[in-house]
Amino acid sequence: MKIVLATGNKGKLREFRQMCQDEVLPFSDLLGMFEIVEDGDTFAANALIKARTIYNKLKEKHPEEAYVVIADDSGISVPALGGIPGIYSARYAGEGASDKENLYKLIDTLKEKDFKSTPAYYTAAIAIVSDLGEYVVHGWMHGNVIDEARGDKGFGYDPMFIPAGFDKTLGEMDDGVKTAISHRGKALSLAKPIIQMLKNKEKNASDLK
């Protein structure tokens, strides 16, 4: 059974590989790189769109193979700004915007509102699609966003987000600390037993053949 990650984001792939003991393949290794239209209105809907798209294409190409496709949709929400960027976090500065462009647009928005620091939270939805069903789990991380970028670790909005109980941004933290507290880490801790269950069921089914 192959575990395939439905993302082309190198930062996300690195995080998933750190958190998973199994080898995780980016979908581009099997299908080549292409864009997936994410037109859902929630993180969960977008994660499912990505996972289903990759799963269906893999099964068309290799119907005899067993796959577990994992997709995550995540973003940051700032209540004082009406919840933005939310599900538009990856394209807050426009379609095709870089992480840096999105980051500095949110920093500029905070400055325009004269917010030095304000509460915010990350959401991660992980969708799991296989022959044996579909599942979605969530994880959250609360803290504050600040009107400057600090640190060069992580990706996305990490350099402006300070998790609750810490005085450093995610961009200043080592990967091990970040993984232990991150929204994606929390969601993946719920996804892992589901993935293991699917692997066990697939193995049992193979043994009976």
From Swiss-Prot:
Enzyme Commission number(s): 3.6.1.66
Keywords, in A-Z order: Hydrolase, Magnesium, Metal-binding, Nucleotide metabolism, Nucleotide-binding
GO molecular function, one term: XTP diphosphatase activity
Similarity field: Belongs to the HAM1 NTPase family.
Subunit-structure text: Homodimer.
Primary role: Pyrophosphatase that catalyzes the hydrolysis of nucleoside triphosphates to their monophosphate derivatives, with a high preference for the non-canonical purine nucleotides XTP (xanthosine triphosphate), dITP (deoxyinosine triphosphate) and ITP. Seems to function as a house-cleaning enzyme that removes non-canonical purine nucleotides from the nucleotide pool, thus preventing their incorporation into DNA/RNA and avoiding chromosomal lesions.
Record's protein name: dITP/XTP pyrophosphatase
